[in-house]
């Protein structure tokens, strides 16, 4: 982003943005009290008079036009093959910035084995380039694979391209994501997640069914993307006819070009619209409160246009959604209502699709999203962006073997991507809930995942695909040797590797289950312990956000409601109790049951989806889903301990819990059913850092189980 000092590029002077006096149609809107530090308020129900969020208009960014998601009819209607519909869609395609580069791109792809395509989110590269390939002579046989870091992007892009091709989803165009494959023998354009293409490498090491591999959103540098980059570099040496296209929305193309030995770089010029950047004058002490106030300031004072708000996670999104709905009731009748639409990765697919539909009549749509909306998806109608400048980022401490998910500042590159969402279709505005000085302190780029997260899944993926030497793999950015060694140790602890570090039969079976290694190991152990159905239920609960709600204004009631589900042996069995009771309730009463028991219906829907998919996966492999009315808690906990042997801690004489790996002092999180209790040993699902090191998803175990489950590992550590 080019900085402009003193004046904006459009010639306007820098002015203080005092958008509203806090009054909406003569009524004073209420908002939560501010906190003293810059964090989301935990007590979002305490109300005080709204103060104005003052912004300084400083810079102008640019976005680009976009079509994905702009055809807002239902998916069924979008796939209708009427002549008028096809004509309208063709006109939309021709209006995309990339359309003019059609001939040049086709020639570049034809002439080069690897090219790097750089184009803003909205240029049309994700939808159009796969279709351009159909006209290339080399691409008349086989299929093109287009990878995406996120499932929602793979699904939405496939639906859009199917509409543009005038076919049903699953015919010429389809998608493949975890547990959901809509492709067929007719499919020639296949959207899939990075992880799914990595899975295909197990049975087809050279990906022979594809004439072209397109790695989209490569700039995000997810762990799976970096793994694919390394494998693709090996594959092109074995397949001279294969074409590879690396696509990025940011100007870091040289790194990708260098990795592929000087690959050609193609820059797609976007149709740019100005985006005015507004910073706060001073740091906001409570960014969630500031977002709420800014939403109403924009809604009451600025012209029509939808609002996109970047938040850090589901909890914040749902809290702000509830506040917006509550305070919207105070809006006068002459103003449009606000339609709040959440968007996060674990949101059920049909609810995610609501984001892409137009707002209801006499409503302004406010999309509350994680960083999923930075580049992976396109939402039409956005004119205003509110950016907290924060995201939840995984960090792994290889010395202690502990991974945490913490809220951290984003990079300048990510901030620019966020602001650009306001300028895809017309001039827009971005309101950053931080000062310009804070922006200048942000790192230029986001650190690649491979340098900061647990590498256990990556190492298992490599070894299952024949890459035994994980240190000398073709990494774009090599991970630390310490991180790789910790991953090898973890995989050895759960029985995936033999004494020489080679993958064994158990490890190979784990690699075939689309779960994290620890959870995959628990599923395999459950077959031996005759509790597969119960373990699948618990794994489903652990694979998304908590189903239990604790609204601040009814916290005591929520705690009381959860008592009926509590199990003396901890959180895993507590979750199982709640899920079982829900399934036993009548279909007609389930909505009321959730409300009475403070159960998050949205999370529960995701849990049930994962449960259904996991059960189908097991049945497909011929596994018996044995279950019994009386749960054998010991067998269930032993199954999980097989995958969580490194996530255990012993009670010490001073009353503290210390991990068996690293001797780290940890505390049981207050939300746990074991909070305040002392048991000889515990097993936990995750560790989070707040004021201290807390563990969640905690279960009580017996200390003598440790040697029974992993004697090979504990014996080796003691020598």
Swiss-Prot record:
Keywords: ATP-binding, Helicase, Hydrolase, mRNA processing, Nucleotide-binding, RNA-binding. Transmembrane segments: none annotated. Pfam families: DEAD, HA2_C, HA2_N, Helicase_C, OB_NTP_bind. Signal peptide: none annotated. It is an enzyme of class 3 (hydrolase). GO terms for molecular function: ATP binding; ATP hydrolysis activity; double-stranded RNA binding; helicase activity; RNA helicase activity. InterPro entries: DEAD-box_helicase_OB_fold (IPR011709), DEAD/DEAH_box_helicase_dom (IPR011545), DNA/RNA_helicase_DEAH_CS (IPR002464), HA2_WH (IPR048333), Helicase-assoc_dom (IPR007502), Helicase_ATP-bd (IPR014001), Helicase_C-like (IPR001650), P-loop_NTPase (IPR027417). Residues 1-48, 64-88 are annotated as: Disordered. The keyword ATP-binding applies. A motif (DEAH box) lies at residues 216-219. Its EC number is 3.6.4.13. Residues 74-88 have a biased composition (Basic and acidic residues). The keyword Cell membrane does not apply. ATP binds at residues 119-126. GO terms for cellular component: nucleolus; spliceosomal complex. It comes from the Eukaryota. Residues 294-466 form the Helicase C-terminal domain. Residues 31-45 have a biased composition (Basic residues). May be involved in pre-mRNA splicing. This is Probable ATP-dependent RNA helicase prh1.
């Amino acid at each position: 982003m080019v900085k402009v000092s003193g004046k904006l590029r459009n010639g306007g002077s820098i002015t203080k943005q005092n958008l509203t006096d806090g009054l909406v149609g003569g009524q004073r809107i209420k908002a939560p009290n501010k906190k003293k530090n810059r964090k989301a308020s935990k007590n979002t129900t305490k109300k005080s008079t709204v103060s104005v969020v003052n912004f300084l208009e400083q810079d102008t960014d640019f976005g680009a036009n976009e079509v994905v998601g702009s055809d807002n009819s239902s998916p069924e209607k979008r796939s209708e093959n009427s002549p008028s519909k096809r004509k309208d869609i063709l006109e939309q395609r021709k209006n995309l910035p990339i359309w003019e580069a059609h001939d040049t791109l086709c020639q570049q792809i034809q002439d080069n084995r690897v090219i790097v395509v750089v184009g803003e989110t909205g240029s049309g590269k994700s939808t159009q380039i796969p279709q351009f390939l159909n006209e290339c002579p080399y691409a008349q046989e086989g299929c093109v694979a287009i990878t995406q870091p996120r499932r929602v992007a793979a699904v939405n892009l496939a639906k859009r391209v199917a509409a543009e091709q005038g076919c049903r989803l699953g015919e010429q165009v389809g998608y493949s994501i975890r547990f959901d494959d809509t492709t067929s023998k007719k499919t020639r354009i296949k959207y899939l997640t990075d992880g799914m293409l990595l899975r295909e490498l197990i049975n087809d090491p050279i990906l022979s069914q594809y004439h072209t591999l397109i790695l989209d959103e490569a700039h995000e540098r997810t762990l799976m993307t970096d793994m694919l980059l390394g494998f693709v570099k090996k594959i092109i040496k074995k397949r001279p006819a294969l074409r590879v296209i690396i696509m990025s929305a940011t100007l870091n193309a040289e790194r990708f070009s260098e990795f592929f030995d000087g690959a050609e770089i193609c820059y797609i010029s976007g149709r740019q619209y100005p985006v005015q950047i507004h910073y706060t004058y001073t740091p906001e002490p409570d960014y969630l409160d500031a977002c709420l106030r800014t939403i109403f300031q924009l809604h009451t004072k600025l012209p029509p246009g939808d609002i996109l708000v970047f938040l850090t996670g589901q909890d914040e999104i749902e809290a702000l959604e509830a506040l917006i709905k509550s305070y919207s009731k105070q809006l006068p009748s002459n103003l449009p209502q606000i339609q709040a639409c959440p968007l996060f990765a674990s949101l059920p697919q049909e609810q995610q699709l609501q984001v892409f539909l137009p707002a209801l009549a006499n409503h302004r749509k406010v999309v509350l999203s994680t960083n999923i909306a930075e580049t992976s998806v396109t939402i039409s109608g956005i004119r205003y962006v509110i950016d907290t400048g924060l995201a939840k980022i995984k960090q792994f401490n290889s010395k202690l073997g502990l991974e945490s998910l913490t809220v951290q500042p984003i990079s300048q590159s990510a901030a620019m991507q966020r602001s650009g969402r306001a300028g895809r279709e017309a001039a827009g505005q971005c309101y950053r809930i931080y000062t310009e000085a804070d922006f200048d302190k942000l790192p230029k780029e986001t650190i690649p995942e491979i340098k900061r997260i647990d590498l256990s899944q990556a190492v298992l993926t490599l070894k299952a695909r024949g890459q035994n030497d994980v240190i000398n793999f073709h990494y774009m950015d090599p991970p630390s040797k310490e991180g790789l060694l910790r991953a090898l140790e973890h995989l050895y602890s759960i029985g995936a590797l033999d004494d020489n570090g080679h993958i064994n039969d158990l490890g190979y079976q784990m690699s075939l289950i689309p779960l994290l290694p620890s959870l995959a190991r628990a599923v395999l152990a459950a077959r031996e312990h005759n509790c597969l159905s119960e373990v699948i239920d618990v794994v489903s609960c652990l694979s998304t956000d908590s189903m239990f709600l604790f609204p601040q204004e009814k916290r005591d009631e929520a705690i009381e409601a959860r008592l009926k589900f509590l199990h003396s042996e901890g959180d895993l069995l507590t979750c199982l109790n709640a899920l079982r009771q829900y399934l036993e309730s009548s279909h007609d009463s389930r909505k009321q049951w959730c409300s009475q028991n403070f159960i998050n219906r949205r999370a529960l829907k995701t849990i049930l989806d994962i449960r259904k998919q996991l059960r189908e996966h097991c049945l497909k492999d011929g596994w018996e889903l044995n279950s019994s009315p009386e749960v054998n808690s010991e067998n269930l906990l032993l199954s999980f301990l097989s995958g969580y042997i490194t996530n255990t801690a012993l009670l010490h004489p001073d009353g503290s819990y210390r991990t068996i790996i690293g001797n780290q002092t940890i505390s049981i999180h207050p939300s746990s059913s074991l909070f305040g209790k002392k048991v000889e040993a515990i097993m936990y699902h995750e560790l989070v850092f707040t004021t201290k090191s807390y563990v969640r998803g905690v279960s009580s175990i017996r200390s003598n189980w440790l040697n029974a489950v992993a004697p090979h590992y504990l014996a080796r550590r003691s020598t």
